[in-house]
């Protein structure tokens, strides 16, 4: 099933890319465990990594610091490798409240979660691809270091069907039930099967648009065919098919029976300890909860919160690392850590927070001590499991630099010839008035401005001040959710307003070629918001515009400012020299505005949660100008229905696009009436 990686791109590597690709590939072939790619904003870091993957033909996992950047990378990799398996693995919770106990108020908070079915399907598809093929790129968030089902047990549970095999229909149904598939003859959806005479239709858990039909004749598999579950149309007939479990946490019956005995032993030992310490309430609570879980496991093969018994189910010893996505990656796999200066500290912090919450649950009799082993990886375990690694960042952290032995692969020259912004330092005393005049200059020539402040209060006051002086300004703060944030960024790019004020939200991975000025207020106040890395990242937001400029307002030049200015000037010098030698004139990026909202276009545009295929979206600017009022009214009614459908499918970006078009249509309707 595997194919060789085939890179699809109209561009050839240019600028610093060919040298970066050569050095990274040499390092990997020489067996270097750690390498760092220092790639400035807009230098094509993803393209460089895609070239390395295609040249070396190795399965790869790309770690991103959050879902938004993971979706952006997934979209880019999908374009680079349309014929290969590009998969997406992030947390499938839309909402997650872990179980917790607050001793001070004697409050127990039950686990409460809302699972996004579409992302669950993509996670299952990712592990299936990792087990079946070598031409796989999995883009994952830090969710990859959390416990997952053991790959060995997962493989043992698979159901293989081949044409001509002798198998009883009831045996197939029993095996499907063990894989946690549910029979549903009415609503045929992901993770279910239906039976009609000697025909069994199975909707694989990892698929979103293809189902399997098994036709039996007297205990023999006569035909296997793939069909569209929506239309029932046969797509192809196949000689064999493998059905994977519905969940990563599925376990063979004999392993469950063995695990139950081990759980009973631990329960007896723990009860003894609690009674010796006169903790009668905790002992009774633990006994009641564990006995209930054991009965559920005995009857159904699983229970709510079964992940708390994962140590027994995977057969691992106390304190051993849980099985994670890394266990599914082949031994010669490659790990790419994107925005490593953010991702690496995140990995280090996950274990400690999880541990503190679970210790309270164990102490007060809500969980057995073995629940502590259902956890994310410790940092040292992550280091031990990680294959050959490339850290990618515009501002690598000390950890990455130390691991790479100070030998950093530089990717400073952009293929477009764009230079790093010019930096100016100006006094704090007149910063607001000076900023106002700079904003007016930029707004007059249809360019945008980003302003970063130190405090929420200052951001609010500045926004109010700029509004009073007639500027079109918005404030981006931490209470805004991801989708709304993307809408604000899109509106900035479309020119709905000229200035965006924020605190710490203007750093990694924001693509805005229209921004020609970044203003950093109180740049001389040392701290994490004004550290060398933060300053370089923020300055980089203006690096996608030909007229890019950064103004740092400060009365003195701090060590962080000096380093950030020095590094930016070093890069600018190198870029200028390259441009002169090769006769390159810097060109602004002409990135379509919809691109930023198509972060994970392949995620949103696939079939949404079994509700039928998403309908194509009409571009907001394709509004017919010569429609009659009646036709406009009909069009508005149609689009309102489509907008609600997208919102229901959680495709908020598409819904927002239609909302903008509706706004234009309503204005036309009023004018025409």
Swiss-Prot record:
Belongs to the UvrB family. The gene is uvrB. The beta-hairpin motif is involved in DNA binding. The UvrABC repair system catalyzes the recognition and processing of DNA lesions. A damage recognition complex composed of 2 UvrA and 2 UvrB subunits scans DNA for abnormalities. Upon binding of the UvrA(2)B(2) complex to a putative damaged site, the DNA wraps around one UvrB monomer. DNA wrap is dependent on ATP binding by UvrB and probably causes local melting of the DNA helix, facilitating insertion of UvrB beta-hairpin between the DNA strands. Then UvrB probes one DNA strand for the presence of a lesion. ATP binds at residues 39-46. This is UvrABC system protein B. Residues 431-597 form the Helicase C-terminal domain. Residues 633-668 form the UVR domain. Induction: Induced 1.5-fold by hydroxyurea. It is found in: Cytoplasm. Residues 608-627 are annotated as: Disordered. Forms a heterotetramer with UvrA during the search for lesions. Interacts with UvrC in an incision complex. Gene3D superfamilies: P-loop containing nucleotide triphosphate hydrolases, UVR domain. GO terms for cellular component: cytoplasm; excinuclease repair complex. InterPro entries: Helicase/UvrB_N, Helicase_ATP-bd, Helicase_C-like, P-loop_NTPase, UVR_dom, UVR_dom_sf, UvrB, UvrB_inter. According to PubMed:3515321, a cleaved form of the protein was observed that resulted from the removal of about 40 amino acids from the C-terminus of the protein. The exact cleavage site being unknown, it was proposed to be between Lys-630 and Ala-631. There was no indication that cleavage occured in vivo and therefore it is not known if it has any physiological significance. The record marks 630-631 as: Cleavage. HAMAP family: UvrB. Keywords: ATP-binding, Cytoplasm, DNA damage, DNA excision, DNA repair, Excision nuclease, Nucleotide-binding, SOS response. GO terms for biological process: nucleotide-excision repair; nucleotide-excision repair, DNA damage recognition; nucleotide-excision repair, preincision complex assembly; response to radiation; SOS response. A motif (Beta-hairpin) lies at residues 92-115. Residues 26-415 form the Helicase ATP-binding domain. It comes from Escherichia coli (strain K12). GO terms for molecular function: ATP binding; ATP hydrolysis activity; DNA binding; excinuclease ABC activity; identical protein binding.
């Amino acid at each position: 099933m595997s194919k060789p990686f085939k890179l699809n791109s109209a561009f050839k590597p240019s600028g610093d890319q060919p040298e970066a690709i050569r050095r990274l590939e040499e390092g990997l072939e020489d067996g270097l465990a750690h390498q760092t790619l220092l790639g400035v904003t807009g230098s094509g870091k993803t393209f460089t990594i895609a070239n390395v993957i295609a040249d070396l033909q190795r399965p790869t996992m790309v770690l991103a610091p959050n879902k938004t950047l993971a979706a952006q990378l997934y979209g880019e990799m999908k374009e680079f490798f349309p014929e290969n398996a590009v998969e997406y693995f992030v947390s499938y919770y839309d909402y997650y409240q872990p179980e917790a106990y607050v001793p001070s108020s004697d409050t127990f908070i039950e686990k409460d979660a809302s699972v996004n079915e579409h992302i669950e399907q993509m996670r299952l598809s990712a592990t299936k691809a990792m087990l079946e093929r070598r031409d796989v790129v999995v883009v994952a968030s830090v969710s990859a270091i959390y416990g997952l089902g053991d790959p060995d047990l997962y493989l043992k549970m698979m159901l293989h069907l081949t044409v001509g095999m002798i198998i009883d229909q009831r045996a197939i149904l029993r095996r499907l039930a063990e894989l946690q598939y549910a029979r549903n003859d009415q609503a045929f959806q992901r993770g279910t099967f239906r039976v009609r005479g000697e025909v069994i239709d199975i909707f694989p858990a990892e698929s979103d648009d293809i189902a399997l039909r098994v036709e039996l004749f007297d205990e023999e598999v006569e035909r296997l065919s793939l069909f569209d579950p929506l239309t029932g149309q046969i797509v192809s007939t196949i000689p064999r098919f493998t059905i994977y479990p519905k969940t990563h946490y599925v376990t063979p019956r004999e392993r469950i029976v063995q695990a139950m005995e081990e759980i009973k032993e631990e329960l007896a030992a723990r009860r003894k300890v609690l009674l010796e310490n006169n903790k009668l309430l905790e002992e009774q609570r633990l006994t009641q909860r564990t006995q209930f879980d054991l009965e559920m496991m005995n009857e159904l093969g699983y229970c709510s919160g079964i992940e708390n018994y994962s140590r027994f189910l995977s057969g691992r010893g106390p304190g051993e690392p849980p099985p994670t996505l890394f266990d599914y990656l082949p031994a010669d796999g490659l790990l790419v850590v994107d925005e490593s200066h953010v991702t690496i500290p995140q990995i280090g912090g996950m274990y400690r927070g999880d541990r503190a919450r679970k210790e309270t649950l164990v102490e007060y009799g809500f969980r057995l001590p073995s629940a502590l082993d259902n956890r994310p990886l410790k940092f040292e375990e992550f280091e031990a499991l990680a294959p050959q690694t490339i850290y990618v960042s515009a501002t690598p952290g000390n950890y990455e630099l130390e691991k790479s032995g100070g030998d950093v692969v530089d990717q400073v020259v952009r293929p477009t010839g764009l230079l790093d912004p010019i930096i100016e330092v100006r006094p704090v005393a007149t910063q607001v008035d000076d900023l106002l005049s700079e904003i007016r200059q930029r707004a007059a020539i249809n360019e945008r401005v980003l302003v970063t402040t130190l405090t929420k209060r200052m951001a609010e006051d500045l926004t109010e001040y700029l509004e009073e002086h007639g500027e079109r300004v918005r404030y981006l703060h931490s209470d805004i959710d991801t989708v709304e944030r993307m809408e604000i960024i899109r509106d900035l790019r479309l020119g709905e307003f000229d200035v965006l004020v924020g605190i710490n939200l203007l750093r990694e991975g924001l693509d805005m070629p229209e921004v020609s000025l970044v203003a950093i207020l109180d740049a001389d106040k040392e701290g994490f918001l004004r550290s060398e890395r933060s300053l370089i990242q923020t300055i980089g937001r203006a690096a996608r515009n030909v007229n890019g400029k950064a103004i740092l307002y400060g009365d003195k030049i701090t060590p962080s400012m000096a380093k950030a200015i020095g590094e930016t000037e070093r890069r600018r010098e190198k870029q200028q020299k390259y441009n002169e030698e090769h006769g390159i004139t810097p060109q602004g990026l002409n990135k379509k505005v919809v691109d930023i909202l198509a972060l994970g276009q392949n995620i949103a545009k696939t079939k949404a949660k079994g509700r039928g295929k998403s309908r194509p979206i009409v571009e907001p600017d394709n509004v017919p100008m010569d429609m009659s009022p009646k036709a406009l009214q009909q069009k508005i009614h149609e689009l309102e229905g489509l907008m609600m459908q997208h919102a229901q499918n959680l495709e908020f970006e598409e819904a927002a696009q239609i909302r903008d078009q509706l706004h234009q249509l309503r204005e036309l309707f009023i004018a025409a009436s």
